[in-house]
């Protein structure tokens, strides 16, 4: 089934919201997500709350921001493109000459048509982001600058969804909701995860429980960990950071710090069979919330599956990261299925033990074909090869690797053999 168009339409719906690490844009985004997953809980943590080595920052609100040129033209209008205003800009109103103004203008020199994405969360300043082409056309004279913003003691918001399975042990899925109008680096993660959550809520026989969060990057994951660490360390057995999953350029894998968790094994297996040319990165290439989840002392078994990795593609952190050119419906569908395949693999990754000594007699159970066809040999060989490694020690993922076959091509076979009591599940 292709979910790409539905995910793309949802991304289009929330693209223009001004998201940051705090503020109304985060709440608007979470509210939009909750329309798809009504059980999502929107939570808040007060500014100035100590979270490990950090402090929850003040909340940021933008009313308007723009520049009036000497000729009276309005440029860098926040209402036209929210990337024009540097994130967390402090208030400013005044008139500046061109040289003074340039101290507060930011461009992307190598991409003259792009508006760069710039933030200053932890040092108070104001600024505007402008394309190099527009910057080069600025004329001498006096410019009127309006930055109508407010920093105040408020809250940091995040969304949390818990889905109960047969076991208390959890699979953890995390994405961020703190960037303004950018498609792959921002919206691909939360929109894909929204639809994965919708699917999981409809599953009636989940083996594991699920902890799914939508957070501001870095400060959000630090805050969430500070509030939930003991429970997370006790229960989480696998998980994925969901980021940059909307383009068609590549598939990518970023390992956990140790690189040997079930999340790593599953990610490598799934990507091998989806795209054998996938890009494999090292822990040293980390850059998103896996930095916190896999930090020493936290040590959660979290890896990352991307399409093209954040920081790698040229449109990253600019206005060129858009819906249509970078993020497509087909790209989002590919990202969705890569992570869904990984989740399903963890759910199905049981150990099986054959229940008879020597090879079982398949014909008396009606499992051996009586008519020889072109593909008969391959089907029988796969079945017998599968049984031959069901020793109670090999997991289904191990078996798939031994047989050099995608794990999802073994689900039906395992169920059938178990239903005939030829194999049984081992914990």
Spans of features found by a protein language model:
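N-terminal hydrophobic/helix-forming segments and targeting peptides
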Residues: 1-427
């Amino acid at each position: 089934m292709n979910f790409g168009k539905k995910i793309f339409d949802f991304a289009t719906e929330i693209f223009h919201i001004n998201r940051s690490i705090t503020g109304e844009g985060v709440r608007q985004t979470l509210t939009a997500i909750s329309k798809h997953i009504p059980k999502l809980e929107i939570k808040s943590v007060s500014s100035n709350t100590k979270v490990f080595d950090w402090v929850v920052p003040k909340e940021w609100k933008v009313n308007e921001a723009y520049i009036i040129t000497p000729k009276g033209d309005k440029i860098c209008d926040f209402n036209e493109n929210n990337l024009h205003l540097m994130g967390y800009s402090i208030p400013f109103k005044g008139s500046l000459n061109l040289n003074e103004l340039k101290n507060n203008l930011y461009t992307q020199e190598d991409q003259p048509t792009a508006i760069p994405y710039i933030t200053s969360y932890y040092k108070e300043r104001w600024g505007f982001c402008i394309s190099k082409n527009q910057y080069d056309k600025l004329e001498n004279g006096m410019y009127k600058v309006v930055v109508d913003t407010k920093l105040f003691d408020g809250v940091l918001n995040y969304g949390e969804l818990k889905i109960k399975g047969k076991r208390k042990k959890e699979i953890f899925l995390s994405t961020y909701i703190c960037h303004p109008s950018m498609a792959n680096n921002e919206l691909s993660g939360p929109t894909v995860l929204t639809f994965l959550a919708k699917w999981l809520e409809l599953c009636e026989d989940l083996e594991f429980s699920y902890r799914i969060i939508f957070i501001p990057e870095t400060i959000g994951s630090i805050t969430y960990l500070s509030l939930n660490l003991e429970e997370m360390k006790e229960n989480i057995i696998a998980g994925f950071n969901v980021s940059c999953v909307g383009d068609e350029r590549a598939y990518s894998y970023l390992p956990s710090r140790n690189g040997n968790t079930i999340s790593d094994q599953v990610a490598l297996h799934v990507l091998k069979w989806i795209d054998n040319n996938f890009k494999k990165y090292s822990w040293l290439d980390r850059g998103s919330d896996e930095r916190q989840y896999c930090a020493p002392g936290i040590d959660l078994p979290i890896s990352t599956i991307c399409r093209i990795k954040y920081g790698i593609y040229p449109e990253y952190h600019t206005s060129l990261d858009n819906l249509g050119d970078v993020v497509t419906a087909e790209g989002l569908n590919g990202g969705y299925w890569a992570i869904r395949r990984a989740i399903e693999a963890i759910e199905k990754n049981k150990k099986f033990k054959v229940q008879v000594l020597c090879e079982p007699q398949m014909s008396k159970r009606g499992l051996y074909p009586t008519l020889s066809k072109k593909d008969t040999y391959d089907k029988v060989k796969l079945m017998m090869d599968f049984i031959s490694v069901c020793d109670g020690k090999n997991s289904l993922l191990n078996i798939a690797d031994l047989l050099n076959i995608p794990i999802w091509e073994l689900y039906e076979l395992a169920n059938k053999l178990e239903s005939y009591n030829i194999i049984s599940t081992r914990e």
